[in-house]
Amino acid sequence: MSVRHSGIGMTSPRTRVRMVERLREQGVRDEVVLAAMGSIPRHLFVEEALASRAYEDVALPINYGQTISSPWIVGRMSELLRNGGNNSLRKVLEIGTGCGYQTAVLAKIANEVYSIERIGPLLTRTRIRLRELGIRNIYLKHADGMRGLLEAGPFDGIMMTAVIPEIPETLLEQLAMGGRMVFPKGNRQQYLCVIDHTTEGFVETILDEVMFVPILPGTINR
């Protein structure tokens, strides 16, 4: 089974360059993140019928009621996780693998990436896609992301790619001292937030207004 498709026209390397230039204009400043996003063929992470729109600044459907986040969201969340390079990101946990694009970006800016996806068939396709791209520092697991991945923690960074009303205590316990969590929080009204694990405890900062699909418990096998 292969999930590759061709990259021509609006999926050319020049299109990635223009995407990165647009991200700079939109305020993404971290050159490590921009280089990572410029090196990854985003069009390979969407259905072929949508490949020509892959570099537009929009979220796109990826089946199973899920979406691939817009380039700006991916850049913004990745930049926040790196925290200006102050977070070393030796080990990162991603909750919500989805199509794997954000996962691939994380693999470029972190030493090890552990990613959890609740939808089994979606994870199978993503696993193949990442393998075909030669990305090896990613560990994927089919599981309920609400529980995190205690056996692999603690993590220098945790990223959640679906909105949640409140962060469960079990996830906070998996954030290393000095680490940072980036996630969308809310219900109808949603905000991008960060939680820093400091010597004084967990410090939450509310940032941009956003819109994400909700996180759901349990797993889907077919």
Swiss-Prot record:
Q: What biological-process GO terms show up in the record?
A: methylation; protein modification process; protein repair
Q: Which family does the record assign?
A: Belongs to the methyltransferase superfamily. L-isoaspartyl/D-aspartyl protein methyltransferase family.
Query: What is the name attached to this protein's record?
Result: Protein-L-isoaspartate O-methyltransferase
EC main class here is transferase
Q: Give the EC number(s) under which this enzyme is classified.
A: 2.1.1.77
This protein's UniProt keywords: Cytoplasm, Methyltransferase, S-adenosyl-L-methionine, Transferase
Annotated compartments: Cytoplasm
What molecular function terms (GO) are annotated for this protein? protein-L-isoaspartate (D-aspartate) O-methyltransferase activity
One Pfam annotation, family name? PCMT
The yes or no answer to whether the keyword Transferase is present is yes
Cite the PANTHER family for this sequence.
PROTEIN-L-ISOASPARTATE O-METHYLTRANSFERASE, PROTEIN-L-ISOASPARTATE(D-ASPARTATE) O-METHYLTRANSFERASE
Q: Does the keyword DNA-binding apply?
A: no
Query: What is the role of the protein in this entry?
Result: Catalyzes the methyl esterification of L-isoaspartyl residues in peptides and proteins that result from spontaneous decomposition of normal L-aspartyl and L-asparaginyl residues. It plays a role in the repair and/or degradation of damaged proteins.
Q: What cellular component terms from Gene Ontology apply here?
A: cytoplasm
The reaction(s) catalysed by this protein are:
[protein]-L-isoaspartate + S-adenosyl-L-methionine = [protein]-L-isoaspartate alpha-methyl ester + S-adenosyl-L-homocysteine
Q: Which residues form the active site?
A: S69
